[in-house]
Amino acid sequence: MAKSDGDDPLRPASPRLRSSRRHSLRYSAYTGGPDPLAPPVDLRDALEQIGQDVMAGASPRRALSELLRRGTRNLTGADRLAAEVNRRRRELLRRNNLDGTLQEIKKLLDEAVLAERKELARALDDDARFAELQLDALPASPAKAVQELAEYRWRSGQAREKYEQIKDLLGRELLDQRFAGMKQALAGATDDDRRRVTEMLDDLNDLLDKHARGEDTQRDFDEFMTKHGEFFPENPRNVEELLDSLAKRAAAAQRFRNSLSQEQRDELDALAQQAFGSPALMRALDRLDAHLQAARPGEDWTGSQQFSGDNPFGMGEGTQALADIAELEQLAEQLSQSYPGASMDDVDLDALARQLGDQAAVDARTLAELERALVNQGFLDRGSDGQWRLSPKAMRRLGETALRDVAQQLSGRHGERDHRRAGAAGELTGATRPWQFGDTEPWHVARTLTNAVLRQAAAVHDRIRITVEDVEVAETETRTQAAVALLVDTSFSMVMENRWLPMKRTALALHHLVCTRFRSDALQIIAFGRYARTVTAAELTGLAGVYEQGTNLHHALALAGRHLRRHAGAQPVVLVVTDGEPTAHLEDFDGDGTSVFFDYPPHPRTIAHTVRGFDDMARLGAQVTIFRLGSDPGLARFIDQVARRVQGRVVVPDLDGLGAAVVGDYLRFRRR
């Protein structure tokens, strides 16, 4: 329920009401719009989908566009909304046709002629026989028949009424094409009503004449609206807004005409001259159309549609259908988001609500809010090159998600360390305990003072006195530091065999684990293809697969050695994820480091250089684990031999278990 007073449905109606009747509030039914009680947009699912697409090789901008197109588990995407828009358009064309006015005129004409024949059959004079001959000679064309009957002297009052209805219907249909709702509004209209319509058209054309010459003023417009505002429910605020609304409707009327067959156009053109019994209305509308086409040449005045259904539309209904179709086509383009600079804010929510209902507009508004929220809450930002990128906050969230999935696979193993002792050099655990003789941990000041205050609460003292019994210390734990090198294969085979995304999620999970639970550890991610290079988690996430020859594990091991030597006091760990034999190495790493030798099958020199790299890891005391992906027998033989040589381990996980295998191995080392 929402209150009827004020714009805010949850706010008291006015300060005066609140002061005079402090506890009195008035409520009325909720009238639509955004749900004021709806929960905020959930970004977790959205960010996870964007991260998946970025890791698969899409840019953040492209990933966001794909998310908006697909939607989420709980939110309809733009593609589905566009499909509904296109379905509605096809339905309008398939179910309806534009013969309604001609069919209705023919029906009224037949009824008028039949009633007149019945009246003539009862008459015995010669004039009645002559009148029957006139009716027999009427042409088959309804337009020509109506024209010939213009001077006919009707004997039947019922027949005369039917014939007058034809002229009245034509006038109302022509006006309904330009002013929505006129057909119903003028049903049973009097001559005075028709005179007011004619006067409105004359005044409107005069106003547009002045506007075309640049002589109109806001006062002219205000006077016109004061006099004729009832004909314009859109309530335009100036001449430009008036032109916008009139031109859209007039362009739809022109497309209605373009969609007719030549025979239908000829019939309606001839009939239009009889609207309201004279050609004056048609002349006024032609003058109005000329003004609108000159003022708004960008409207679609030449388009047409092919209707193929059985439901007949009149001129006004057909014009509205064509206006709806144009609006639907515009919505389809907006929802496609396929043009430069596209944004969900471009979608006309009012038009979407008119065509598909309020829920569709709510869904589109939520998509736009989702797009803004990802930027405003810091998950997307722009780099120095102006390109969108995932922010550090987004990377932390993606790492958290990846680690959560890995933790579920590890079945509750938490990786606690066994080396835990109190000491000033340790890291705070968040716990406190009473001080004991020999403790070197820092005092926890807040707990110490609280104990002293509570102990002396019953006594009155000018100052707080602290005793040994009050002192509590902050508990710490000593953490053994590790230097971890994660070597991930980024050769093109990883992309081709669908190992790209699991590899990236594995790296993200390990990175997040180290950054949040083992902050003293030094993790270095090294990506190796034809060359090897150190990368951040964000760089690896956005790394695109590139077709290039070479799996240069030798270069990666050399970079890992540098990392381990920089952290000589830490326990060294080397984790290698690869799906192929080493096929490249650096010939002159100590020189310029740019000369790559490639050969397939692997050249003995490449094997020798790579083995020496593993030997170097062993000399540094590194715990080496190799995660072999795929079933390449050559890789299996090489990895098994190397692992025995350096006393390392070989793990052969499936793709779904890669993250759990790598993180689990790291935790196994940390528990030792």
Curated annotation (Swiss-Prot):
Residues 1-10 have a biased composition (Basic and acidic residues). One of its GO terms (cellular component) is plasma membrane. It comes from the Bacteria. Transmembrane segments: none annotated. Residues 1-41 are annotated as: Disordered. This is Uncharacterized protein Rv0959. The lineage of its organism: Bacteria, Bacillati, Actinomycetota, Actinomycetes, Mycobacteriales.
